[in-house]
């Protein structure tokens, strides 16, 4: 039961972060999953596990959220990924739900070019640590 709850909390927190990113009005909305064939942005959560568990069963769960982007214009892509990192790590308040709250977002991996496709689209990757408090 608690594994299902944690997955639900993590999914809700990731969707909330995606909503923050989509509010930045970048060249594309961000979607969960893999990059498509055209220009775009995607995110997906990596391995998560509680960082701390307290006697009252509250937990801090650091999510490793991978952000990938693809665009045929390197400057457009670089500005978008950098805007995501700057905007989310500088926020003073974060979304919350009934049993969870994002308490901090930091850069885990700086944005970097990881390749260029045959279609001449650049691919960039980065990741954020999204720290979520649960069972508030």
Regions found by a protein language model. Give the residues of each.
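Intrinsically disordered, low-complexity regions of eukaryotic proteins
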Residues: 46, 65-66, 103-106
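Predominantly extracellular/luminal cell-surface or secreted proteins
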Residues: 31, 70, 87-89
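Oligomerization/assembly interface segments of phage tail-like spikes and tubes
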Residues: 59-75, 84, 122-133
